[in-house]
């Protein structure tokens, strides 16, 4: 479904090179020490970075140089990028039509995803009137309403308290299962990864150093467990 073949990004003295295959509907965690290339990997998939070499295909179609706006991918950041002067409804509506001219079917999609996210009673509010968790629900709704086959998460819930973070992870996982979306999530927490991803990828020094079952990482038995400070 998603295939990266020697996708290379030149960053100062460190060339980062990734090869990875992810099947449709998989939920995969991307783990590793800070500054080793996790976010770079997501940005290459999303198209925010242009690789120096290599190829990237989605469903067999070459998207190596496809602009971000035309890739079948949605991405959610820690900074939710909501527009402060737009209401919740308008921020979600941007995912359907950048001009916010929504037809009846699009209006229904917008309200359906708002109900799913539990924010249908907040549609007339501005982002500044919401809590941190509510803002991330709005940002997630904007991603999901686009119904792209791939969702990328770059630690969007790391600033939330533990209970709320777990709630959001469960919501993301359930939503992806319902929409049959492929999920790739950058995280610093193996415990968070284990909650929604049976498979993990460990990035170190601009490479994929290990990939396999998340539970193996948690057990301390994987060769990459030590990179994450986990001992058996």
Curated annotation (Swiss-Prot):
Supply the EC number(s). Answer: 7.6.2.15
List the GO cellular component terms.
plasma membrane
Question: How is this protein situated with respect to the membrane?
Answer: Peripheral membrane protein
Q: Where does ATP bind?
A: 32-39
Main location class: membrane
What does it catalyze? thiamine(out) + ATP + H2O = thiamine(in) + ADP + phosphate + H(+)
- InterPro entries, A to Z: AAA+_ATPase, ABC_SmlMolc_Importer, ABC_transporter-like_ATP-bd, ABC_transporter-like_CS, P-loop_NTPase, Thiamine_ABC_ThiQ
* Subcellular localization: Cell inner membrane
Which SMART domains does the entry link to? AAA (SM00382)
Keyword set, alphabetical order: ATP-binding, Cell inner membrane, Cell membrane, Membrane, Nucleotide-binding, Translocase, Transport
Reported function: Part of the ABC transporter complex ThiBPQ involved in thiamine import. Responsible for energy coupling to the transport system.
Task: Quote the PANTHER family the UniProt record gives.
Answer: SPERMIDINE/PUTRESCINE IMPORT ATP-BINDING PROTEIN POTA, THIAMINE IMPORT ATP-BINDING PROTEIN THIQ
Q: How does it assemble?
A: The complex is composed of two ATP-binding proteins (ThiQ), two transmembrane proteins (ThiP) and a solute-binding protein (ThiB).
> What family name appears in the similarity comment?
Belongs to the ABC transporter superfamily. Thiamine importer (TC 3.A.1.19.1) family.
- Give the protein's recorded name: Thiamine import ATP-binding protein ThiQ
Q: Which organism is it from?
A: Shigella dysenteriae serotype 1 (strain Sd197)
Name the gene.
thiQ
């Amino acid at each position: 479904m998603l295939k990266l073949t020697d996708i290379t990004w030149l960053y100062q003295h460190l060339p980062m090179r990734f090869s990875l295959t992810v099947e449709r509907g998989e939920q995969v965690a991307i783990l590793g020490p800070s500054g080793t290339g996790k976010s770079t990997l997501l940005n290459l998939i999303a198209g925010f970075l242009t690789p120096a070499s290599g190829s990237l295909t989605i469903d067999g179609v070459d998207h190596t140089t496809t602009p971000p706006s035309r890739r079948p991918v949605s991405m959610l950041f820690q900074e939710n990028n909501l527009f402060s002067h737009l209401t919740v409804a308008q921020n979600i509506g941007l995912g359907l039509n950048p001009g916010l001219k929504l037809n009846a079917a699009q209006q229904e999609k917008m309200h359906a995803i708002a109900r799913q996210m539990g924010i249908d009673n907040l549609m007339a509010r501005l982002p500044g009137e919401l809590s941190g968790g509510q803002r991330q629900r709005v940002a997630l709704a904007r991603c999901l309403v686009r119904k792209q086959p791939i969702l990328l998460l770059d630690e969007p819930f790391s600033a939330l308290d533990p209970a709320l973070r777990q709630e959001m992870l469960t919501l993301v996982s359930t939503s992806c299962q319902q929409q049959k979306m492929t999920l790739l999530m950058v995280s610093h927490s193996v415990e968070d990864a284990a909650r929604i991803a049976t498979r993990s990828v460990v990035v170190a020094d601009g490479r994929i150093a290990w990939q396999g079952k998340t539970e193996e990482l948690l057990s301390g038995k994987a060769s990459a467990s030590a990179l994450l400070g986990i001992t058996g």
